[in-house]
Amino acid sequence: MAPSHPHPARRSLITGAAVLAASAALTPLTASAAAAPQRRPRGGDAYPHVQWIPASPSNYTAANRPKQHPIEKVVVHVTQETYRDTLRLFRNPAHRASAHYVVRSADGHIAQCVRERDVAWHAGNWGYNTRSIGIEHEGWIDDPTWFTKRLYRRSARLTAAICDRYGIPKDREHIIGHVEVPGSTHTDPGEFWDWARYLQLVREVSWQFEMDTELDVFDAPPAGSARERAGRRR
């Protein structure tokens, strides 16, 4: 649940933690590694029907997970931005934050922005960054209409696949909200995120090779007041 006192934008908060991450021992990925938006990441990270839209190399740290760091958790986020604007932020070298995946509200379309082997700067806690996969969900924490059936189901499929890949238990100890990260000042995914529904889906679904139509990443956001609310933050 969002605190009663105002906070800065979640992106500005993440940025501060990301600067600390940049000083870690891992070597930042060079600019030449940034792939074109339609290419999939190397190393087998991509799941079927996930669109590769890379974050700027300035916004994450190159690594060799799980050899270098075990992957033990999935962290659920809410963007407080539109899908389109979130991707633009991740591709901005000055932003200093990223997540591995972003799920679109209207249709559950998934963009992968950082390879799973690399450390996305999403949790605001370096230890949690190194040991987790971050999934952003388009929406605002005070408006549950953004948490659509398709968003829940596609995200749950992705989380289930990640858990299966790394042997992560499908429970609330290992699938957590950003708010649960130690030292976090964030409140996402918020009180309207249906954890019972989400965990049930994670345990029931499997990644399906659906013949989905790849949609343009710069499609308009779902109908509503997204542009009017673009300045709102938790």
Language model segments and positions:
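N-terminal catalytic cores of peptidoglycan-degrading enzymes
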Residues: 2-124, 129, 232-233
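Short strand-loop junctions, especially beta-strand C-caps/beta-turns
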Residues: 79, 138-140
